[in-house]
Swiss-Prot record:
A Pfam family that the UniProt record links to this protein: RnaseA
Entry-linked PROSITE patterns: RNASE_PANCREATIC
Role summary: Endonuclease that catalyzes the cleavage of RNA on the 3' side of pyrimidine nucleotides. Acts on single-stranded and double-stranded RNA.
InterPro entries: RNaseA, RNaseA-like_dom_sf, RNaseA_AS, RNaseA_domain
CDD domains found in the cross-reference section: RNase_A_canonical
Enzyme class: lyase
Protein species of origin: Boselaphus tragocamelus (Nilgai)
Binding partners and assembly: Monomer. Interacts with and forms tight 1:1 complexes with RNH1. Dimerization of two such complexes may occur. Interaction with RNH1 inhibits this protein.
EC number, UniProt record: 4.6.1.18
S-S pairs: 26-84, 40-95, 58-110, 65-72
Protein name: Ribonuclease pancreatic
Record localization: Secreted
GO terms, biological process: defense response to Gram-positive bacterium
Length: 124
C-alpha cells in the first residue's frame, strides 16, 4: 500500500522541472501521476523544488491547517509551483485542466518518523 509520504510525492512533487513546461502540463501530469483514474481530481498543486527543500518545510513556520488541525507548516521562502484546476468542460474520463504557474509559500501537513509532508494544504 502506498504510504502517505509516497502519495504526497506522487501527487505534489515534480523536482525534474523548474516550472510547467507547457499549457498542457497539467493534463499530462494529472494523468501520468494517476489522479484521473476513477474520477478527475478537481485541484492539485505540483512543487518544482527538491524533495529535501520541501521536506525541510516540516521544521519551518508552524501554522494552522485549513481544517483547523495544527500539524501544518508554511515555507519560509517562496517556491516554484504549478496549480492544476479542472476546467468547466472537463468530464471523466476525459479530464481537462488549466495550468497556472506561480511562486508562493507552500503549507503542508507533516507526520511520522522521519517527519515528512503527507498533505498539501495551501499556497499563500
Amino acid at each position: 500500500k502506498e504510504t502517505a509520504a509516497a502519495k504526497f510525492e506522487r501527487q505534489h512533487m515534480d523536482s525534474s522541472t523548474s516550472s510547467a513546461s507547457s499549457s498542457n502540463y497539467c493534463n499530462q501530469m494529472m494523468k501520468s501521476r494517476s489522479m484521473t483514474q476513477n474520477r478527475c481530481k478537481p485541484v492539485b498543486t505540483f512543487v518544482h523544488z527538491s524533495l529535501a527543500b520541501v521536506q525541510a518545510v516540516c521544521s519551518z513556520k508552524b501554522v494552522a491547517c485549513k481544517b483547523g488541525z495544527t500539524b501544518c507548516y508554511z515555507s519560509y521562502s517562496t517556491m516554484s509551483i504549478t496549480b492544476c484546476r479542472z476546467t468547466g468542460s472537463s468530464k471523466y474520463p476525459b479530464c481537462a485542466y488549466t495550468t497556472t504557474z506561480a511562486k508562493k509559500h507552500i503549507i503542508v501537513a507533516c507526520z511520522g518518523b522521519p517527519y515528512v509532508p503527507v498533505h498539501f494544504b495551501a499556497s499563500v
